[in-house]
Structure formats: C-alpha cells, structure tokens
C-alpha cells in the first residue's frame, strides 16, 4: 500500500485554505516530495506526517510557487535529527538555487545530493523504493513531469521451491533476492519465485501544455495528478498563452493514457470554486476529482 497526498493545490499565489503546489508519496515509511510551495510544512504538520523521513525532493521547475517552501523545510528536517543524505532533483539551475540557500542554512547535519536535469532527454533515477521516470514538458522555462513507480516483489511459489529441491533454510533469503551457493550447487531467486506482479504508478505534471509524449509517459498510471489552472473551456486561449492546461485538456490526457484516476491541482488564484467546473473534465474522463489541500488516499496493490 502506498499513500499519496496533495499538500497544496494552488498556483501562482496562496489564497485562504489553499497552499501552493506540493505533493508527497509515502511507502514503507519513506517519503518522496514533489515541489515545495508555501504552506508545505503547515499541511505536513496538520496531517501529523513526519518530515524526518523525506528522502527525495523533486522539482518540476523553478517558479516561486513551486519552490518557496524549500528553505524552511530543509531547516525543519535538520532540527528533526536526520543525518542521512537527501536527494534533490530538478532542472538546470538547481545547484545555484541550493547553494544560495547556504546563506540561510549554512550548516545542515545531513548532506544534499543534487541531480540537475539538462536538455529535453528522458531521465531515470532509482532512490530507495522509488523508481523515478522524468520527462521534459512544454512550459515557458525548463520544466519536468515525474512518474513514480513502486515495484512489487514477486510472489513466493512453494510448489516451485519444492520441485527445484531448494532446502527450506534458503527460502527466506532467496525470496529477498539473494543467491546462495552450497558446494557446487547455485540456488537463485528464480527457483522459488513465481510470476511478476504489477506495482503502482503515480504520475505528476504541472505547468505544461498537453502533448503526445505526456500521454505515453503517464500511460496506465494508478493516479495521474495534473494541473488544471483554469476550469472554464473559454479560458483555453489563456492556458495556451501561459503554457498551462484547462480541466478538459487534462481529462483528454487521462482518457487517452487509460489512467485509473485523475486528480486536478494547481488552480489559478482566480479559480475560487474549481468544483463548479468539474463536469468539464468528467464529461471526458469520469474518474476525476478536484484536488484539495491535504487530500490523502491509500493506493493498494492489485494481485
């Protein structure tokens, strides 16, 4: 089971009851944060989620509404007693931005490992439980979408283990992926494991125009979290001008990508009641929700 939470659903500037953009994934006690707008810490505090075990921070791009909460978050993590390194991934400019934070936080008890993304190529990073796929998207400055895959272990096959005459004392280690050599015999995980099982896929895209590449990138996601800067179809010209999306465009991506759920987020501060426009998305992709700050859902593995 994996927990997904929208910490903030606002774009451009915060308004009452709507923090700026941030999303967090929690799995097996470890956390991955995407974007860190103003109010990120407030939402985490209200939820009671521990900050200390945030291992990875991903940035889509470096507009202030996506990054302004970072200095305070790093200092709070420092005060939590964390000593393990934190990995931060983001577009070109990441190194300068984080180095600039040294003015505010000159000494941290943990190291920061920086991964700076250049150009428009696709990237992949594996950090702990999280397999992170990265796609360059269409915004006014370098911007990236992220897809987080959590793999599921293959199922133990008792009949297969017995058929292969694997000693009982080796079953546990083989199930964990270890190989064991005894005398001239090599025992491998394949001798006790059955078929592969589908994991979970959470995809996240804000500040982008639609594209065919994005559809393929988020294909078959269990949850697709996508910006819906404007709800009204009549504001499409504005979305095109500022390189954002309207609700119906996000819904088309969700439908074509055959995702399980679409969560809309990153609303314009002028969009006070996004729920009023939900039918613009639902008419295209039924399983759509309007994101709210601190909306949490547990996503279960399917057999």
Curated annotation (Swiss-Prot):
Zn(2+) 1 binds at residues 61, 63, 139, 207. Keywords: Endonuclease, Hydrolase, Metal-binding, Nuclease, tRNA processing, Zinc. Coiled coil: none annotated. It is an enzyme of class 3 (hydrolase). Binds 2 Zn(2+) ions. Gene3D superfamilies: Ribonuclease Z/Hydroxyacylglutathione hydrolase-like (3.60.15.10). It comes from the Bacteria. Its EC number is 3.1.26.11. Zn(2+) 2 binds at residues 65-66, 207, 266. The active site is at residue 65. The keyword Nuclease applies. CDD domains: RNaseZ_ZiPD-like_MBL-fold. Its cofactor is Zn(2+). One of its GO terms (molecular function) is 3'-tRNA processing endoribonuclease activity. It catalyses: Endonucleolytic cleavage of RNA, removing extra 3' nucleotides from tRNA precursor, generating 3' termini of tRNAs. A 3'-hydroxy group is left at the tRNA terminus and a 5'-phosphoryl group is left at the trailer molecule. PANTHER family: ZINC PHOSPHODIESTERASE ELAC PROTEIN 1 (PTHR46018:SF2). Belongs to the RNase Z family. Zinc phosphodiesterase, which displays some tRNA 3'-processing endonuclease activity. Probably involved in tRNA maturation, by removing a 3'-trailer from precursor tRNA. Homodimer. HAMAP family: RNase_Z_BN. This is Ribonuclease Z.
């Amino acid at each position: 089971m994996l927990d997904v939470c929208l910490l903030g659903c606002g774009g451009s500037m915060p308004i009452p009851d709507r923090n700026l953009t941030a999303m967090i994934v929690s799995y097996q006690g470890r956390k991955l944060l995407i974007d860190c707008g103003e109010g990120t810490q407030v939402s985490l505090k209200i939820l009671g989620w521990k900050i200390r075990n945030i291992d990875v921070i991903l940035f889509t791009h470096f507009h202030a509404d996506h990054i302004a909460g970072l200095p305070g978050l790093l200092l709070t993590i420092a005060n939590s007693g964390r000593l393990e390194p934190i990995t931060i991934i983001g577009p070109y400019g990441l190194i300068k931005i984080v180095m600039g934070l040294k003015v505010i936080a000159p000494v941290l008890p943990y190291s920061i490992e920086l991964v700076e993304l250049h150009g428009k190529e696709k990237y992949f990073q594996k950090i702990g439980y999280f397999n992170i796929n990265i796609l360059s998207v269409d915004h006014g400055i370098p911007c990236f979408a992220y897809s987080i895959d959590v793999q599921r272990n293959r199922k133990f096959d008792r009949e297969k283990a017995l058929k292969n005459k694997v000693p009982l004392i080796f079953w546990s280690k083989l199930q964990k992926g270890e190989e064991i050599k005894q005398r001239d015999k090599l025992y491998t995980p394949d001798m006790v494991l059955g078929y592969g099982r589908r994991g979970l896929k959470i995809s996240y895209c804000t500040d982008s125009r639609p594209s065919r590449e994005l559809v393929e990138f988020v294909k078959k996601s269990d949850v697709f979290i996508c910006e819906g800067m404007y709800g009204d179809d009549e504001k499409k010209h504005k979305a095109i001008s500022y390189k954002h999306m309207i609700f119906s465009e996000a819904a088309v991506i969700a439908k074509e990508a055959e995702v399980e759920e679409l969560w809309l987020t990153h609303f314009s501060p002028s969009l006070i009641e996004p729920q009023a426009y939900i039918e613009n998305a639902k008419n295209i992709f039924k399983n759509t929700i309007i994101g709210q700050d601190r909306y949490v859902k547990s996503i279960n593995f399917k057999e």
